[in-house]
């Protein structure tokens, strides 16, 4: 660990020699070990263990990572607490992500915040099928499917499930199925995401990591779209052009 980095605690800390870690970073291993992978770039940040930061991942200055797993080739900023973020996901800006699970290729817009605690301090319920189930957990954030995206200023209530390739705007107080553009939170009408558009958007995102979409990946996206069609129908969305009012 470079001498300019502040180290706290006695649990093991591993920083790959190819990592670029900035002066002023704090690594607090009091509560658990810390791993920082190859060719990662750590701006002036606080990392509180246990924590894992994968290879090629960039932490923006003044990020706070606590008790979390960050996958490979991610772009991370703001506050992350007790969460799992898989590969190629962007959360580059300020905003809070807590007690949540985030899939691959997700883009979380600036000032997006997940609630993970009810104002009543009661346990969080989730909808499973047609029923609401008490999780027995008092701190529970959201579950983001692969390729989902949030606009700036999105606020997501406790225990929400966000589908694959879904786009979110505004306040989210219920689950959102896959391939839905959710505009209800800003006064717009929800719409079904056209699968060809979703594939186009995903190809653009992959190109920013110098990755070409395989034919198998494209087929997978189409298959998931077909598999989740009933969910969208039951949700009341239909194919239409989405507009922001």
Predicted regions and their residues:
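Tight coil/turn sites that cap or link beta-strands
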Residues: 18, 24, 39, 56, ...
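A short linear-motif detector with a strong N-terminal bias
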Residues: 5-6, 13-14, 37, 54, ...
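Glycine-rich hexapeptide-repeat left-handed beta-helix
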Residues: 61-62, 72-239
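Extended, small-residue-rich solenoid/repeat segments and analogous flexible loops
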Residues: 1-47, 53
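Transmembrane beta-barrel architecture of outer membranes
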Residues: 22, 43, 60, 69-71
């Amino acid at each position: 660990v470079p001498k300019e980095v502040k180290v706290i605690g006695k649990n093991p800390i591993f920083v790959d020699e190819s990592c670029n870690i900035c002066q002023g970073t704090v690594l607090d291993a009091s509560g658990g070990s810390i791993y920082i992978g190859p060719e990662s770039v750590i701006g002036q940040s606080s990392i509180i263990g246990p924590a894992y930061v994968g290879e090629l991942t960039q932490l923006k200055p003044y990020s706070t990572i606590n008790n979390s797993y960050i996958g490979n080739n991610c772009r991370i900023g703001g506050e992350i607490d007790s969460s799992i973020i898989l590969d190629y996901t962007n959360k580059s800006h300020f905003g809070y992500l807590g007690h949540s699970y985030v899939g691959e290729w997700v883009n979380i817009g600036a000032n997006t915040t997940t609630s993970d605690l009810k104002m009543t301090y009661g346990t969080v319920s989730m909808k499973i099928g047609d029923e609401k189930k008490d999780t027995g957990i008092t701190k529970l954030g959201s579950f983001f499917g692969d390729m989902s995206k949030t606009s700036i200023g999105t606020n997501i209530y406790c225990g929400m499930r966000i589908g694959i390739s879904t786009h979110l705007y505004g306040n989210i107080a219920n689950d959102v199925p896959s391939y839905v553009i959710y505009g209800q939170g800003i006064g717009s009408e929800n719409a079904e995401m056209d699968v060809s558009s979703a594939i186009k958007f995903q190809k653009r995102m992959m190109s920013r990591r110098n990755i070409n979409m395989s034919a198998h990946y494209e087929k997978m996206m189409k298959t998931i779209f077909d598999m989740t069609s009933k969910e969208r129908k039951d949700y009341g969305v239909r194919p239409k052009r989405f507009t922001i009012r």
